[in-house]
């Protein structure tokens, strides 16, 4: 927001330059990003046109322009150039804000000695709806005077970068309060009063939802004449970046800037009845707002309505059906307090943020509404020639009660780490508008209505610290702080990430918001997935409009982006949350670990680089589980995952609980992403993984006795997974069986149709004795018997 230095001086005497003021405000937490002088106009003055004549054969005009000292001959194409009128005039050598330097030049045989200017050429906003042409200056403008003096541009703008809690400083008055506290000078704030009359407000006001509208005031002004505002008012708006419209609307915008109170003007004759109803919109109700857009409302939104229809979206924008135009004769001026949360939600749902909604969202001064409304009414009467009809209407269901905070100075000293002078503390708080009552052990601070951000004792400490000056606080080292260890959850997460990094993977972090088209690329039903997905109401873009239910889209996008940049060999992982709808409650969050392998793994002096494959990624997961102390893991073929190759995919189990999958990306998905090499991916449920980690590791001493290995070759049906044989053998619970390893699988014609040979190595060992041949043979017999009974396996003898 831009604040005029000159305008601030109307509220408070300022002993600082604009630059110094910016630094002072920043030091007390009102950040001033930059201070800009806006009167940089050289050789641009008020010019009076003395004569106008047409240039033969053209649509141009030859004029004589006086600067009081000299007369210049100027050619212009503007249609609104008339003798006796005054306009901004650029002398030869003048440099305009758009970078153009004005020089004498010949136009159609006439030497033009300068240029008459429009508002746009001066870098100013044109009045809305104004005919294009020269900027007309008031008759009283002194001929030859510098244009920055006449247009009040001999001024500085302070560009503020406010924190969200300081909505009170979104106005000249709010900043002036801070300036008064800084300087110690009195704040000049008059309370305008209406002339006495005996009538009441001719418009009835009804608030149906006091929670969303805490106060509503209005006043009727009749016999107004809508037209352009005086130059000084237009210039105040222009300096703040607001385009002038007409004297009625300009006054409401002026009050918005000066007091921070949004107002709205209705054409009273366009209302169906002389009544204002503040109510919730009805489901499906529509309104065309002033920007010409028809908007559908919901029952959560607050509207201003007459007897028949909505006429404004409360706190955001008025409707076209009651817009003030050139034919308006009677206006109703609204000033109100609307619930900040309600305004914010409505603005977000409608995708409509305005200067008014910005202020309502940050809470306006409910006690300052009357001051703003009365001043606006008096200004309209002065500038538009109207008269106030009756009194103002004021519906105020629950009067404001100031919050009183008990403040202990000893606790404040402990909090701030410095000694405080009670008298100075009271001075600071009173200069900021707080009322202070001194008690025996505490002071009691009454918070003004325009500071809703102050609600706790700690907030008062902050106010004190701001004006004591943070630079005056001594540097001290922390005392008595002991370090604490990391939580078990953090330690486990750190361990998993370290293990994956040790296995050659690199961690990435991607956005939680994805493009819904990502599901289509993965071969999933978009409609089906979206029923479970959290869809954003107001996304930054369609590419980030849905919260992810899987980590795959982010992993694949990053891998493809790197491949496009010739980084084709990747081994990446991500640990992050995915989100799923959970009825009316907050979304369900689950933490997953996802990974992707692409291209070739690095070779060495005796091995050439080899492509990442299914077994390499499977080996990463096996190593991870083993390092975490998990031995009871298994894999089973998965043919029903649409984004994975049906013959090169598996589900991952820990203790018979499915926790994820791995596999090669489906060829169709690979084609959609246009990968050159085939990606391998995996995804594990991290939250489940945490619960399946053994509570503690038990020490098992090494056996001093020799191990015995036996190999068997089995003839089995081709479709039986290799893991089945391991599960059957483990199910025998032979306590001396230490290791089971499948070391060969063979298929050939001599085995017979749909048959394969699988070779298994078994390792036996005891910590108590050397196992005898008879014991080993007995164990092997148990194994063969169980395998034959449960899988139909036969001992292969050929």
Swiss-Prot record:
All residue ranges annotated as the FDX-ACB domain in the record: 703-796
UniProtKB keywords: Aminoacyl-tRNA synthetase, ATP-binding, Cytoplasm, Ligase, Magnesium, Metal-binding, Nucleotide-binding, Protein biosynthesis, RNA-binding, tRNA-binding
Superkingdom per UniProt: Bacteria
Protein name as annotated: Phenylalanine--tRNA ligase beta subunit
Pfam families per record: B3_4, B5, FDX-ACB, tRNA_bind, tRNA_synthFbeta
Location of this chain's protein in the cell: Cytoplasm
Organism: Carboxydothermus hydrogenoformans (strain ATCC BAA-161 / DSM 6008 / Z-2901)
Co-factor remark: Binds 2 magnesium ions per tetramer.
Catalysed reactions, semicolon-separated: tRNA(Phe) + L-phenylalanine + ATP = L-phenylalanyl-tRNA(Phe) + AMP + diphosphate + H(+)
Ranges of residues in domain tRNA-binding: 38-148
Cofactor entry: Mg(2+)
Coiled coil: none
Residues that coordinate or bind Mg(2+): 453, 459, 462-463
Upper taxonomic lineage: Bacteria, Bacillati, Bacillota, Clostridia, Thermoanaerobacterales
Main location (coarse class): cytoplasm
Family label: Belongs to the phenylalanyl-tRNA synthetase beta subunit family. Type 1 subfamily.
InterPro entries reported in the protein's UniProt record: aa-tRNA-synth_II/BPL/LPL (IPR045864), B3/B4_tRNA-bd (IPR005146), DNA-bd_dom_put_sf (IPR009061), Fdx_antiC-bd (IPR005121), Fdx_antiC-bd_sf (IPR036690), NA-bd_OB-fold (IPR012340), Phe-tRNA-ligase_IIc_bsu (IPR045060), Phe-tRNA-ligase_IIc_bsu_bact (IPR004532)
Enzyme Commission number(s) from the entry: 6.1.1.20
One MF term in the entry's GO annotations: phenylalanine-tRNA ligase activity
Keyword Glycoprotein: no
Keyword ATP-binding part of the UniProt annotation: yes
HAMAP family documented for this protein: Phe_tRNA_synth_beta1
